[in-house]
Amino acid sequence: NINNSGLTHSDPLDGSPQYMHFTTKNGDTRTFQYGSRATNPIDQWPDPDIYTHKSSGQTLSGSETRNLNRCYPGVEDGTLSEQVAYAVTNMIKTLDIDMEIDLHESSPEYAVNNATVAHERASAIASEGVLNLELEGISMSLEPSPVSLHGLTHRELGDYTNTYALLMETGNPSQGRLRGYTDEDLVKTGEDPCY
């Protein structure tokens, strides 16, 4: 998680576990913190009634101001979320990073699921990747990055840097609204009787 503030909380009413534990081949236990992609309200408050994306002027619900994936390419002296997005954009430019893949999980009922979303400059690479996954028996669709929806990594990093910008979205019931009890097992296995 590139937004450390997001690791300090979970989304309201989600009841997500705070940590996940994995046992390695040699028997050691590795612990990973589990949080939200949204900046903790303690670190960025209050939410405005309407969030205005700085570089495009697009308006969204006020709570989206803390959603990192609505803040790209970022603002150097903006909110914490906008500063994190700016730092990522600046790092990609400074290091001349060729390709970035933003990994997401979504609820199984989400419309864009098991999909690769590609900026138009990255569509050839994404097409080949999706085809290779399909040949391996992994179902994946290809979606174009919407030109008119701003703040998203695959749109803004593709527009504001030279990187090939991609996002991969996979479904996991631990993100779903219809799930049952949420624990470490559900997060790791993605198995829930409600799905």
Language-model features and meaning:
Residues 76, 80-195:
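C-terminal accessory segments enriched in acidic
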